[in-house]
């Protein structure tokens, strides 16, 4: 069996159905004896260029180990699913299990978000401090 990296983009109006699509695709891979090394749901993201007058899409990344028959079946499923805007299947030299850069960036943003909340809480205090000075003048 060979190792593959699969990225597919789903129509933003079909974002609710992404979980079912992932289940269906991973199920077909595991039923055929393949393994899934990495599965990342990147969520809705801005695309680099519009596709069918759409500017956003729901991205999913999978690293799998499977046979050629399964990959042909998966490619056919992508082709006939109208919700899948684009897909890319690349053969890799080995299994990739570490987090992708996209997911690391998403987690870093999530860690920084509480800091922004702290700043927003502090900002009114500074304004309150400025008000008594203005009243003294």
Swiss-Prot record:
The keyword RNA-binding applies. GO terms for biological process: translation. Residues 104-137 have a biased composition (Basic and acidic residues). One of its GO terms (cellular component) is cytosolic small ribosomal subunit. CDD domains: bS6 (cd00473). Keywords: Ribonucleoprotein, Ribosomal protein, RNA-binding, rRNA-binding. Belongs to the bacterial ribosomal protein bS6 family. Binds together with bS18 to 16S ribosomal RNA. This is Small ribosomal subunit protein bS6. It comes from Vibrio atlanticus (strain LGP32) (Vibrio splendidus (strain Mel32)). The gene is rpsF.
């Amino acid at each position: 069996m060979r190792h593959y990296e699969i990225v597919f983009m789903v129509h933003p109006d079909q974002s609710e159905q992404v979980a079912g699509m992932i289940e269906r695709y991973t199920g077909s891979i595991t039923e055929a004896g393949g393994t899934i090394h990495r599965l990342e749901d990147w969520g809705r993201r801005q695309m680099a260029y519009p596709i069918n007058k759409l500017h956003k899409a729901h991205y999913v990344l999978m690293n799998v180990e499977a046979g050629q028959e399964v990959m042909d079946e998966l490619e056919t499923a992508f082709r006939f699913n109208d919700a899948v805007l684009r897909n890319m299947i690349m053969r890799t030299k080995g299994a990739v299990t570490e987090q992708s850069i996209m997911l690391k960036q998403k987690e870093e943003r999530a860690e920084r978000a509480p800091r922004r909340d702290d700043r927003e809480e502090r900002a009114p205090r500074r304004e309150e401090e400025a008000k008594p000075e203005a009243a003294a003048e």
